[in-house]
């Protein structure tokens, strides 16, 4: 089955970050579902009070498995649990107006371009999906994310991690998927 998440593009339209994501899911006896998710995350954020701007865009990938929790495994509806391992390697830019040096006077530039970073994380997944018509299915998933490892650039934490979300924000996330069983 191939699917797309519809929340990410909507999030990108109404906020300063979001993502495009597609998934490939294999059905093993209506019980186990190995999953590969590939996406492209973007952020273009500005803080009005500090005038600091943050920008990134990069691909990310997740791999994992779901399992059907229902007793009747062959039903048109599925209740599933699972996990994912996620990874992204990305660059980001931080720009800001110069800072006034209080000791020596004058302006000191502040910002960085092309700061390299990477992130590894795990996700616990719980969700439902249902057959809508023919091969078309729709469903949602709720995700709890936990960072495993990270490499931040020389200027500290990035504002947004493609595929993971905002740093320092909620560890909770979700998807709303439209899937085509092939």
Predicted features along the sequence, with ranges:
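Outer-membrane beta-barrel "beta-signal"
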Residues: 62, 66, 168-182
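Extracellular loop and loop/strand-boundary signature of outer-membrane beta-barrel proteins
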Residues: 7-10, 47-54, 108-114, 161-166
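Transmembrane beta-strands of outer-membrane beta-barrel proteins
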Residues: 2-4, 34-36, 61, 77-83, ...
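Short glycine/proline- and aromatic-enriched beta-strand/turn motifs that initiate or cap beta-hairpins
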Residues: 1-28, 177-182
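Outer-membrane beta-barrel proteins
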Residues: 10, 28-30, 66-72, 89, ...
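Short sequence motifs at beta-strands and strand-loop junctions characteristic
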Residues: 14-16, 55-57, 112-121, 166-170
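Outer-membrane beta-barrel pore domains and translocons
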Residues: 5-9, 39-41, 68, 84-88, ...
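Gram-negative (and chloroplast) outer-membrane scaffold detector with strong preference
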Residues: 32, 37-105
């Amino acid at each position: 089955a191939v699917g797309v998440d519809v929340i990410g593009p909507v999030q990108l339209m109404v906020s300063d970050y979001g993502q495009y994501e597609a998934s490939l899911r294999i059905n093993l006896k209506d019980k186990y579902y190995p999953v590969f998710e590939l996406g492209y995350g973007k952020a273009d954020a500005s803080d009005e009070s500090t005038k600091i701007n943050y920008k990134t865009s990069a691909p990310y990938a997740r791999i994992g498995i779901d399992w059907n929790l229902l007793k009747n495994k062959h039903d048109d509806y599925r209740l599933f649990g699972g996990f994912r391992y996620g990874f992204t390697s990305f660059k980001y830019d931080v720009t800001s107006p110069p800072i006034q040096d209080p000791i020596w006077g004058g302006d000191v530039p502040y910002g960085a371009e092309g700061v390299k970073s990477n992130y590894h994380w795990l996700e616990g997944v719980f969700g439902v999906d249902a057959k809508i018509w023919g091969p078309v299915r729709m469903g949602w998933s709720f995700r709890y994310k936990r960072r495993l490892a990270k490499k931040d650039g020389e200027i500290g934490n990035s504002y947004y991690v493609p595929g993971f979300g905002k740093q320092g924000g909620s560890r909770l996330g979700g998807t709303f998927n439209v899937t085509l069983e092939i």
